[in-house]
């Protein structure tokens, strides 16, 4: 059983993902994979330097994420910079995700495997595999902005820029067969997640 899990930035997807892992799902975290491919020695880092220039690196040779974010998501980002970054990172991330899924299925053929993909709505047609179900975690935009300012050290403008560069709620809902409302009390949200996992586990 292959599940796609998505949601807007700061919507609460990580909380849902962690709950599914507790229940026994194998969660493949695409944010973690994205960090891995840009680490020193990672396949994406030299190509990012080639594309964006040496200023994308810190003095210690690691990726300057703040610089890259400003030049990809910021108000003065060069047109097409997001697409260039995605074209470097995404194929490497998909390849590693497939490897992790194959490894899990070798030991647990009927496992519920959750692909935790923040930008699923943007890339769903480009993925080399399809999902049995897709769930999206949603919260009102203003609540998400407040969370980013409070917990991620962003300014309001930076938070709005991040949201602007993601798919809209309507686009996520168009690909999903399940909506998880993260503004409901945590206990109720966990009850919904638990029911979903039981359903997926039975189908697997």
Spans of features found by a protein language model:
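ATP-dependent small-molecule kinase phosphotransfer cores
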Residues: 35-111
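Residue-level signal for inorganic ion chemistry
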Residues: 12, 31, 85, 114, ...
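Short, structured coil segments at secondary-structure junctions
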Residues: 23, 52, 129-131, 175-176
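An amphipathic alpha-helix signature
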Residues: 23, 45-49, 141-149, 156, ...
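Small-molecule kinase domains that catalyze NTP-dependent phosphoryl transfer to phosphate-bearing small molecules
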Residues: 99, 123-128, 150-203
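Well-ordered beta-strand positions
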Residues: 26, 32, 133, 177-178
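Glycine-rich phosphate-binding loop of ATP-dependent small-molecule kinases
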Residues: 1-63, 74, 199-204
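ATP-dependent NMP and nucleoside kinases share a basic, alpha-helical "lid"
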Residues: 98-107, 113-147
């Amino acid at each position: 059983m292959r599940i796609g899990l998505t949601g807007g930035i700061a919507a609460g997807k990580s909380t849902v993902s962690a709950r599914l892992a507790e229940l026994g799902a194998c969660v493949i975290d695409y944010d973690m994979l994205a960090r891995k491919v840009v680490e020193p020695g990672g396949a994406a880092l030299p190509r990012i330097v080639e594309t964006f220039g040496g200023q994308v690196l810190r003095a210690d040779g690691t990726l300057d994420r703040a610089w890259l974010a400003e030049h990809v998501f910021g108000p003065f980002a060069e047109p097409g910079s997001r697409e260039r970054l995605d074209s470097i990172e995404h194929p490497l991330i998909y390849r590693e995700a497939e490897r992790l899924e194959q490894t899990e299925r070798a030991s647990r053929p009927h496992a519920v495997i959750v692909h935790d993909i923040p930008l699923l709505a943007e890339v769903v047609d480009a993925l080399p595999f399809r999902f049995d179900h897709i769930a999206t975690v949603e919260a009102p935009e203003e609540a998400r902005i407040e969370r980013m300012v409070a917990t991620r050290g962003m300014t309001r403008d930076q938070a709005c820029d991040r949201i602007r560069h993601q798919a809209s709620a309507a686009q996520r809902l168009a690909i999903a067969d399940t909506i998880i409302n993260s503004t409901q009390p945590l206990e109720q949200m966990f009850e919904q997640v638990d029911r979903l996992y039981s359903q997926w586990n039975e189908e697997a």
